[in-house]
Regions:
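Active-site nucleophile loop of the alpha/beta-hydrolase fold
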Residues: 217-227
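Flexible, membrane-associating and regulatory peripheral segments of lipid-active enzymes
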Residues: 1-121
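The feature captures the conserved acid-bearing segment of alpha/beta-hydrolase catalytic domains
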Residues: 228-295, 307-320
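Cap/lid segment of the alpha/beta-hydrolase catalytic domain
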Residues: 151-171
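Alpha/beta-hydrolase active-site loop
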Residues: 166-185
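Short, surface-exposed "cap/lid" segments of acyl-processing enzymes
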Residues: 91-148, 155-159
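Alpha/beta-hydrolase fold nucleophile elbow
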Residues: 185-197
Length: 356
């Protein structure tokens, strides 16, 4: 996050002394103040991108309405119009996500009146851009806040979370253990770690460390690349390697998602699958690293998220979303809403530690 929007995204943004409308109005005023100080397009872009990394769907709608009177050529109008048009569902719900900064690198999104026992907790490990491959409200817009809480983690040191998270701890194990003092994983129906790109391997590690139900790693780096990154910063990869090699029971379900036409990501997925029991889901027709962005561009983000999460995004009862098929784009170039069962690209592999 840039310093320019620190006040907008500071911990404790959802304080109990003000209403959601008052907090959104305060955020809007802070946004206007920040962009008024920008003198270059790069400065504007930095502010807008940083805000996109934090705001909720309700805040996007509020900003969109408030900025509708701006001149069409104004940067603020163009930015919020693009952001609002990109919302996958754009549904006004009975309860809405509110955000609360737990510390510098941790933001909690929750509809507070809802019971955690009815919800799935998603712990998101963002990549180096501090987002899950796209603006945060686009991801949140796919989820029913009555059924999901989301905790987004950000690695400002850009060392695969190995130096911890400010305010939680100075290493991965300490930071993740301290997270439980803010968010009670055991209070939820189930808990899933969800990491993209540089956050992929940490998501797998977190699921093992915290005994989560599932880990989803989208376009993760292969472990050798993570180890090399740590080495360049004088950090040891021993704790990460040991955790990947451990087999606590019950062991979390691990799903690795990658673009079928991206050679490096395919190789990284295969390499990780040799280290940890996992399934690999290859997204056909996708040649880019940013798999979630590709699904969004094809209008398939909500059903794709339901598929990889293995449950409905809208209903309490789990949906039937067995990963026995690839997610494809038809030969016409348009998205196919149904998987092609006869052409599976889901590859389970036995635990490598049990191989003969």
């Amino acid at each position: 996050m840039t310093a320019a929007v620190s006040a907008l995204t500071e911990p404790g943004a959802a304080d109990g002394a003000s209403s959601p409308m008052q907090r959104m109005d305060r955020a809007l005023r802070l946004y206007r103040r920040r962009i008024s100080r920008c003198r270059t397009q790069n400065q504007l872009n930095r502010v807008n991108i940083a805000v996109e990394n934090y705001v909720t769907p309700a805040e996007v709608r509020y900003f969109h309405t408030a900025l509708a009177g701006e001149p069409a050529e104004s940067p603020a109008y163009q930015w919020i119009t693009r952001l609002a048009r990109g919302m996958p569902n754009n549904i006004v719900r009975p309860v809405e996500f509110e955000r609360r900064g737990l510390c510098k690198g941790v933001t909690h999104y929750s509809a507070n009146p809802s019971s955690a026992a009815q919800k799935t907790l998603i712990i998101g490990f963002t990549g180096i851009a501090h987002r899950l491959m796209m603006p945060t409200p686009w991801v949140l817009d796919c989820l029913n806040p009555a059924l999901y809480d989301v905790v987004l983690l950000r690695d400002f040191a850009r060392v695969a979370y190995a130096s911890g998270i400010p305010g939680l701890g100075g290493d991965f194990h300490t930071a993740l253990s301290k997270l439980s003092t803010h968010v009670d994983r055991g209070a939820y129906r189930d808990a899933i770690s969800f990491g993209t790109s540089a956050g992929g391997v940490p998501a797998i590690l977190a699921a093992i460390l915290l005994s989560l139900d599932k880990a989803i790693a989208i376009s993760p780096q292969e472990f050798g690349r993570v180890a090399a990154l740590l080495g360049r910063h004088g950090l040891s990869d021993t704790a990460y390697a040991s955790l990947l090699a451990s087999r606590p029971q019950p062991f979390p379900e691990v799903l690795i998602v990658c673009a079928a036409e991206h050679g490096d990501d395919m190789a990284a997925a295969a390499s990780l699958q040799r280290r940890v029991p996992a399934r690999v889901l290859k997204v056909r027709g996708c040649a880019g690293h940013v798999v979630l962005g590709w699904q969004h561009a094809h209008g398939m983000l909500p059903p794709f998220l339901a598929k990889i999460l293995g449950q409905s995004l809208e209903r309490q009862a789990p949906a039937s979303t067995a990963l026995a098929a690839s997610w494809v784009v038809g030969s016409s170039g348009g998205p196919s809403p149904q998987p092609t069962v006869a052409r599976t690209q889901d590859h389970p592999e036995p635990d490598p530690s049990h191989a003969s």
